[in-house]
Amino acid sequence: MSVACQGQKAEQAKKVDFRIVEVEEFAQVMADTSVVVLDVRTLDEHAAGHIAGTKLHIDVLKPDFDSLAVANIQKGSVVALYCRSGNRSKRAAASLADKGYQVIELATGYNGWVQAGKPVE
């Protein structure tokens, strides 16, 4: 096997998986109190309003996102995360899944949650 093929296989093996769900399924996931609900938006966005039941806020755009997440979320935890519209949360989801967390990402983000009439704080 060539070195190029070995590199390709290693890259394929490194792909990370996380579930992308819509609002109703995200709400069902949140009903399990052991799930860590994580807001990955900026501090200003979080302060302006967040999904009721959010347990943790870590801005995915900050350079220390990974280290803060590992320090604050128990290894092996199920993490349900969201951002404003579903873009930044995919980045956070991939990062956390790569670290061994079971990750569920809200496809439509906080905006979709609000549009669905779900509770916010």
List each model region and its residues.
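Short, high-confidence coil segments that cap the C-terminus of an alpha-helix
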Residues: S34-V35, G76
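Short hydrophobic beta-strand that contains or immediately precedes a catalytic carboxylate
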Residues: V36-R41
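Rhodanese-like catalytic fold shared by cysteine-dependent sulfurtransferases
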Residues: S2-V29, L43-V78, N87-E121
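Short, surface-exposed ligand- or partner-binding patches at beta-edge/loop junctions that are enriched
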Residues: Y82
